[in-house]
Amino acid sequence: MNKTEKKFLENMHRQKLVANGDAVLLAVSGGPDSMALLHLFASVASVLHCRLGVAHCNFMLRGDASDADESFVRDACAELGIDFHVRRFDTASVSSAWKKSIEETARLLRYDFFGELCREASYTRIATGHHSDDNAETVLFNLFRGAGISGLRGIRVRHGAIIRPLLPFTRREIVAYLEEKRVVWRDDHTNEGIEYDRNFIRNRVIPVIEERFAHKLMPSLQRISEHAGELEEFIDLHISRLLEAHPGLDLAGGKLHVGTMRQLSMFERKEILKRALKLQGLSVGSNVLNRIAGLLDNQAGRSVPAGAGVEVVLHDGFLRFRQTGNPSDHR
């Protein structure tokens, strides 16, 4: 076991990402990150006492190259004795039908497939190959989109059944590991373009910033991500205590006592509103959230549509969430 494999195993134990008897589904595209994920897991699976399987998505976006990726990953799994699952998607057609970007469509298709495999083949964890450079790029991408604290946190090491055990590793470390182990990988040349937003950030924006501020950008973005994560955990704890201390803030019942809400800071009000909306299955933008928060300073009877047939209305001293029967999206 070399130093990279030891670091990987130590991180798995420290973060408690896998338990004895877990079945881990590895998302493997054939690129360097996912091939490192595959070989690192294969090297420590016996120590972790976990079963491995691989899921490969053929998005049929690159013609013969997509099929070659599929064959490559299939052969790698056969060589390692790991179960291989593949699904082909007509991503371009689905993207058009869903009226979503290719990136978003591929993401949704990918995770639907992973969830289906977990149910059918009893996988308990899904591991992806995101690393620290991906996290830094995500923070920058979210910053450009005007994200709040949650967005600046970047990629979480764990989200439900999904784990990202390569987050402590840089892209450079991953490539060095593959070269040391003489593991080959597939290059997706579409990653070198700038058509997609993330590629534009990776290939144009970051190099320009690093040229001016050498070796400072990635560590700085990583620190921002860590600080945002710590702050988000503090906020979650603080809001949970607020809700426990004030029975009038009944998120589950869909009503919030106006008098109590008015005693809170605007930040606290919005955090509570976001949690109440989440329980309604809603995630609204900042404009709608500001309008809902503004109800606290209005007369009774005023309302704000929150989307998906839900409106927030000021009535009898409470903010109430009620169904309108109109599912139109006002977000």
UniProtKB/Swiss-Prot annotation:
MF terms in GO: ATP binding; tRNA(Ile)-lysidine synthase activity
GO cellular component, one term: cytoplasm
Gene Ontology BP terms: tRNA modification
E.C. number: 6.3.4.19
Keywords: ATP-binding, Cytoplasm, Ligase, Nucleotide-binding, tRNA processing
Keyword Ligase recorded: yes
Keyword ATP-binding carried by entry: yes
InterPro entries found in the cross-reference section: Rossmann-like_a/b/a_fold, TilS/TtcA_N, tRNA_Ile_lys_synt, tRNA_Ile_lys_synt_N
Binding site for ATP: 29-34
Subcellular location: Cytoplasm
Enzyme class per UniProt: ligase
Reaction it catalyzes: cytidine(34) in tRNA(Ile2) + L-lysine + ATP = lysidine(34) in tRNA(Ile2) + AMP + diphosphate + H(+)
Annotated domain remarks: The N-terminal region contains the highly conserved SGGXDS motif, predicted to be a P-loop motif involved in ATP binding.
Family (UniProt): Belongs to the tRNA(Ile)-lysidine synthase family.
Annotated function: Ligates lysine onto the cytidine present at position 34 of the AUA codon-specific tRNA(Ile) that contains the anticodon CAU, in an ATP-dependent manner. Cytidine is converted to lysidine, thus changing the amino acid specificity of the tRNA from methionine to isoleucine.
HAMAP family named in the record: tRNA_Ile_lys_synt
Protein name: tRNA(Ile)-lysidine synthase
Organism this protein belongs to: Chlorobaculum tepidum (strain ATCC 49652 / DSM 12025 / NBRC 103806 / TLS) (Chlorobium tepidum)
